[in-house]
Structure formats: C-alpha cells, structure tokens
Amino acid sequence: MDKLKKVLSGQDTEDRSGLSEVVESSSLSWSTRIKGFIVCFALGILCSLLGTLLLWVSRKGLFAVFYTLGNITSIGSTMFLMGPLKQLKRMFEPTRLIATILVLLFFVLTLCSAFLWNKGLALIFCILQSLALTWYSLSYIPYARDAVKKCFAVCLT
C-alpha cells in the first residue's frame, strides 16, 4: 500500500520544493482519498447517465447540463488520488494521452450530435465516452489496467 501511495503521489520520482509540496499536499488520509475518488466517480457517472436519459426530452439544455456536470465530476474524481496540480500535469503523459484525447473527443462529439445531428448517435458517443473515462481513471491506479485486461481476456476465452 505504501508503494501505491508513493507512485500516485510522485514521491519516488520527483524532488519537490517546499512551496510545491505545500500546494500539492493533501490533508486527507489515503483511505479517505480512495473513498472520495470512488464516490465522485460514481456520482459523475450517475449524472452522465441521467443526462443521457434526458437526451430524449425536448429541452436539450437539461442533457447538456447533467452530462457536462457528470463528466466534470468524473474527471475531477482522479484529483483525490494525487491532487489537482499533479493530475493536470499527468493528464497528457504517454500512458494516458490516448485516453485523455478520447474522453475530450467523445465529449465534444456527444454534445455536437445531441444539438446538431442525431440523438441515437449521441447515445453511442455517451457510451464510448464513459468507457474512455473509465480507462483514463484506471490509469491512475498502478496495474489496474492490466488487471482489467486480464479479466476481459479470461471472460472472452
């Protein structure tokens, strides 16, 4: 567990100055941070699903508000794991670059399809964006992606 804390907080790879340590530190315990991540991520997905259900309501603004709120909450949930500044720095690292781009791309495509194109296409983009967001979030937990890959490999064989 200590190794996981060090990897997520960057203590084993970074030499931090006093000011950056104060700015990036968190007073939350490790278990509270994990619980905060799980709760925020689940609430974000719930808001996104509610927004998706509101896609077929004639007022498209409801869809946009709930879906946007859900995605911001889900992406923000990873800030519990390492802090906001470090997360923003790590969003575009090679290990999660594709997932970050896909999340942002599907978010834009979902809103464009809801307002300009087809609601069915918007639903497909909602599903794809949720999958990309999950993959992005798993990149912050060491070996979580490998575990998911192995689980799916076992299920598919």
Curated annotation (Swiss-Prot):
Top-rank taxon: Eukaryota
One GO process term, biological-process aspect: protein transport
InterPro entries: Vesicle_transpt_Got1/SFT2, Vesicle_transpt_SFT2
Membrane spanning residue stretches: 37-57, 62-82, 97-117, 121-141
Residues recorded with modification Phosphoserine: S9
Cellular component aspect of the GO annotation: cytoplasm; endomembrane system; intracellular membrane-bounded organelle; membrane
Parts of the chain on the Lumenal side: 58-61, 118-120
Ranges per topology, Cytoplasmic: 1-36, 83-96, 142-157
Pfam families on file: Got1
Chain positions found as N-acetylmethionine: M1
Subcellular location(s) of the protein: Membrane
Alphabetical UniProt keywords: Acetylation, Membrane, Phosphoprotein, Protein transport, Transmembrane, Transmembrane helix, Transport
KW Acetylation (keyword) present: yes
Topology in the lipid bilayer: Multi-pass membrane protein
Reported function: May be involved in fusion of retrograde transport vesicles derived from an endocytic compartment with the Golgi complex.
Family to which the UniProt record says this protein belongs: Belongs to the SFT2 family.
Protein name (Swiss-Prot/TrEMBL): Vesicle transport protein SFT2B
Source species taxonomy: Eukaryota, Metazoa, Chordata, Craniata, Vertebrata
